[in-house]
């Protein structure tokens, strides 16, 4: 048997049915002629496919999640003497029986889940690439830009937003001795968020950081006057950008992230 025609019918892209058919056909010594019929939404299309399949003595394999569409195809194909194989329906029915849960009957769910997964991975990779001001070009590409002095949770917040909200985040450290990148003044202020912290809180955090590294907590890094100088520089930069400032002194990463996400969503509404 050469080039047996198989019509792959789906209410979405049809990738699932296509893969299953190819896997099954791979067990036989003939080359299948697989013809995909995607995004089927009405019985008229099904009737047409049945007619064509009959004239070509073809097999129909389908993934239709809506029960009425599945039943129509099976019934009408049988009337015309056309073999129609339901790839996903019996499994959906079995899972419903075992769990007692009603299916959503939404076409293309797997595809949407795959897209969400890859968006998350892309966002995580972006956060790593443009962490700590490594490449200023990321500022203009980012969904969100975080700015702040050292130890204001820029990196963990970037990763949290990437992993949980699928947002591409670049973060930029501010140091008095180094001019901020020009891109920081070019980005839309609505995308930019300054992370502020009290001198006392930051002094404690930095001292603990130095201790964890086996260093003296008397270093300039944890000096209160140095910290105040850095905060003054931060205030000067954010005033020029005119971006929203969030006090992270007593906030968990999740809380700060929610403030940012809500701000972004509100901007999109108006």
Curated annotation (Swiss-Prot):
Q: So what EC number does this one have?
A: 2.7.11.32, 2.7.4.27
Xref: HAMAP family:
PDRP
Keywords from UniProt, A to Z, are: Kinase, Nucleotide-binding, Serine/threonine-protein kinase, Transferase
User: Catalytic activity, per the record?
Assistant: N(tele)-phospho-L-histidyl/L-threonyl-[pyruvate, phosphate dikinase] + ADP = N(tele)-phospho-L-histidyl/O-phospho-L-threonyl-[pyruvate, phosphate dikinase] + AMP + H(+); N(tele)-phospho-L-histidyl/O-phospho-L-threonyl-[pyruvate, phosphate dikinase] + phosphate + H(+) = N(tele)-phospho-L-histidyl/L-threonyl-[pyruvate, phosphate dikinase] + diphosphate
Q: What is the lineage of its organism?
A: Bacteria, Bacillati, Bacillota, Bacilli, Bacillales
Output the InterPro entries linked to this UniProt entry. Kinase-pyrophosphorylase (IPR005177), PPDK_reg (IPR026565)
* Binding residue positions for ADP: 148-155
Q: Does the keyword Transferase apply?
A: yes
Q: Has UniProt tagged this entry with the keyword RNA-binding?
A: no
Record's PANTHER family?
PYRUVATE, PHOSPHATE DIKINASE REGULATORY PROTEIN 1, CHLOROPLASTIC
GO MF entry, a single one:
ATP binding
The record's function comment reads: Bifunctional serine/threonine kinase and phosphorylase involved in the regulation of the pyruvate, phosphate dikinase (PPDK) by catalyzing its phosphorylation/dephosphorylation.
Give the protein's recorded name.
Putative pyruvate, phosphate dikinase regulatory protein
- Which organism is the protein's source? Bacillus anthracis
Similarity field? Belongs to the pyruvate, phosphate/water dikinase regulatory protein family. PDRP subfamily.
């Amino acid at each position: 048997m050469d080039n047996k025609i198989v019509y792959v019918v789906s209410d979405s892209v049809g990738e699932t049915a296509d893969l299953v058919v190819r896997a099954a056909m791979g067990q036989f010594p003939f080359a299948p002629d697989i013809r995909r019929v995607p995004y089927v939404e009405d019985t008229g299309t099904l009737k047409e496919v049945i007619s064509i399949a009959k004239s070509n003595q073809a097999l129909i394999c389908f993934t239709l999640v809506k029960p009425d569409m599945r039943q129509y195809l099976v019934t009408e194909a049988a009337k015309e003497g056309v073999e129609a194989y339901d790839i996903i329906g019996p499994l959906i029915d079995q899972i419903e029986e075992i769990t007692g849960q009603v299916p959503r009957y939404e076409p293309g769910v797997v595809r949407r889940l795959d897209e969400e997964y890859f968006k998350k991975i892309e966002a995580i990779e972006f956060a790593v690439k443009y962490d700590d001001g490594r490449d200023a070009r990321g500022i203009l590409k980012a969904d969100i830009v975080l700015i702040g002095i050292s130890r204001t949770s820029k990196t963990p917040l970037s990763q949290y937003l990437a992993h949980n909200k699928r947002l591409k985040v670049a973060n930029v450290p501010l140091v008095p001795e180094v001019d901020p990148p020009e891109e920081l003044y070019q980005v839309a202020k609505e995308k930019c968020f300054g992370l502020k912290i009290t001198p006392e809180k930051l002094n404690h955090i930095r001292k603990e950081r130095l201790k964890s590294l086996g260093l003296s907590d008397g270093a300039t890094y944890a000096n209160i006057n140095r910290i105040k100088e850095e905060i003054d520089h931060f205030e000067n930069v954010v005033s020029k950008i005119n971006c929203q400032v969030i006090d992270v002194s007593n906030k968990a990463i999740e809380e700060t992230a929610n403030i940012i996400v809500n701000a972004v969503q509100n901007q999109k509404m108006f």
